[in-house]
Swiss-Prot record:
Catalytic EC class: hydrolase
Gene3D superfamilies in UniProt: Amidase signature (AS) domain (3.90.1300.10)
Name listed for the protein in its UniProt record: Amidase 1
Catalytic activity: a monocarboxylic acid amide + H2O = a monocarboxylate + NH4(+)
MF GO annotations: hydrolase activity
Length: 521
């Protein structure tokens, strides 16, 4: 007789919880310099000087990870024992060779549940995928280990992944570090909370509609969505596997831009295309990074996407930051939003092209109930024919071409082309669970396959953002819903993220420009 889905859930959680109850010396104070190290560079200096060991670094972060999980329910698969063993191997390597193994030597890393890690499940929040451990590491994990990184744990995500919050029947609800009644975002929400609470130094998530950038925005982090093909997706489990027209991408999340940049550069310089034939052999372009690290920028600005107006704190932070950019000598250009709605519509049609069959099959394998957002997704429409899919792809290509033409035609008052865009990450800050409905500000750039970095630009402040919202007349149902969520009394102090956006394969440009932007924060 098949086991009930509730029995499987109970067993999976019991295995995780048993690993979390094991003592790793939490009663012994760790070196305060470890957690105080703000980024990889600072940690590397401590390790190189032998002020701390990799083992001590991992132990300190295990303690923080356990605290973060107790507070937010962010972890799924635990590999603390393996992490400590790896850390001791790194210490032995340094003792023998007198140097660190690689640019990520001893860096505690966490992974969204999707990434295959040998011996552990990649469930995607599906009960039916429990107790089917990966036979080998995915390419990204193999390379991370070669670079010296230490994998601590895997983190929670929503059922079927495709949502901006983090909840599923298998692992349960992940909550915001500041308020258990609020969502940390998603779908890389477990990463967002773990990083925000110092349980990891570098996280890796995935993004098909904002899944790296939304939790980064809500948790005060930096989150980088590259174009498809810069980082390996080989052996990373995903819903709707085979749907490649709107590709999910892998990207880093961290508390600092320097960590994002170092991790991105190290991963690209590792030449993962030798292990993953889907990647183009595109090396790190130092000259491009250096150029945009220094040159005055021309920035297209879009505070309103034309569909859903952002809340007052988002608008205030955006406009204040624009003033800083102009004062620093950068040129700002208003951005045309006329193609945005078409981009979102085409993207949504790709999500449901199979009529929900892929998700239904995974759900049938476990027998658990559908989360409301998943039920809504699979009920949205019937599968389309191959010919209809071809026509949809043609519309996508035509719209991408039109957007590119628009970008090329947009110039500053001095006649210079636009380098990057500045855009809100979301129309609101963190909000109550199960109320997120509109990630259009992030989805736009998945449809275009652009490079986009979300960064913490400010916070909602009751003293500055207590404005009357009743005077605004919403444009549509999504806009009305968004405005119904605004409550500055409850949103006071929550992070506000903005995005720097470049075109396809412009990762070095975006990161270089971001370092200029960071100086103004």
């Amino acid at each position: 007789m098949p086991r009930s889905w509730t029995d499987i859930v109970a067993e999976k959680r019991a295995i995780r919880d048993e690993k979390l109850t094991k003592c790793y010396g939490e009663n012994v104070p760790s070196d305060p310099r470890i957690i105080a190290a703000k980024d990889i560079q600072a940690l590397t200096k401590l390790l190189e000087a032998r002020n701390v060991t990799a083992e001590a670094v991992v132990l300190a972060h295990i303690a923080k990870a356990k605290e973060a999980h107790q507070r937010t329910n962010c972890l799924t698969e635990i590999c603390f024992d393996e992490a400590l063993e790896h850390a001791r191997e790194l210490d032995a390597f340094q003792q023998e060779h007198g140097r660190l193994k690689g640019p990520l030597h001893g860096v505690p890393v966490s992974l969204k549940d999707q990434f295959n890690l040998k011996g552990l499940d990649s469930t995607l929040g599906y009960v039916g995928r429990a107790f089917h451990p990966a036979a080998s590491d995915c390419v990204l994990v193999k390379v991370l280990k070669q670079l010296g990184a230490v994998i601590l744990a895997k983190t929670n995500l929503p059922q079927c992944i495709l949502w901006g919050e983090t909840d599923n029947p298998l692992w349960g609800l992940t909550t915001h570090p500041m308020n258990p009644e609020y969502t940390p975002g998603g779908s890389s929400g477990g990463e967002g909370t773990l990083l925000a609470l110092n349980g990891s130094m570098l996280g890796w998530g995935t993004d098909i509609g904002g899944s790296i950038r939304v939790p980064s925005h809500m948790n005060g982090l930096w989150g980088f969505k590259p174009s498809s093909g810069r980082f390996s997706y080989e052996a990373v489990a995903v819903s709707q596997d085979g749907q490649q027209q709107i590709p999910s991408v892998v990207g880093p999340m961290a508390r600092t831009l320097s960590t994002i940049t170092l991790a991105s550069k190290a991963m690209i310089e590792a030449e993962c295309w030798r292990l993953d034939p889907q990647l183009p052999p595109m090396p790190w372009r130092k000259d491009v990074f250096q150029e945009y690290l220094q040159k005055p920028l021309v920035i297209g600005i879009m505070v309103d996407d034309g569909t859903v107006k952002v809340h007052p704190p988002i608008e205030r932070v955006f406009k204040e930051f624009c003033k800083k950019l102009e004062a620093a000598g950068h040129e700002l250009v208003p951005w045309d939003t006329s193609l945005n709605a078409d981009c979102i519509k085409i993207m949504d049609e790709h999500y449901i092209a199979d009529g929900g069959e892929d998700i239904r099959r995974d759900m049938a394998a476990g027998g658990e109930p559908y989360m409301p957002h998943v039920q809504n997704l699979v009920d949205r429409g019937s599968a389309i024919s191959v010919y209809e899919y071809w026509q949809l792809n043609k519309r996508k290509k035509a719209t991408q071409a039109a957007y590119n033409t628009m970008w090329n035609a947009t110039k500053s008052s001095s006649g210079k082309p636009v380098d990057v865009l500045l855009v809100p990450t979301m129309p609101h800050t963190a909000i109550p669970h199960r109320t997120l409905r509109y990630p259009g500000y992030t989805k736009l750039f998945n449809m275009l396959d652009y490079s986009a970095l979300s960064f913490p630009a400010g916070t909602a402040l009751k003293a500055l953002d207590s404005v009357c919202t009743g005077e605004y007349e919403p444009r549509n149902a999504a806009d009305a819903w968004n405005w119904s969520l605004y409550d500055i009394e409850k949103m006071d102090g929550y992070s506000v993220g903005l995005q720097i956006v470049g075109r396809r394969m412009e990762e070095e440009k975006v990161l270089g420009a971001a370092h200029q932007v960071q100086q103004l924060l």
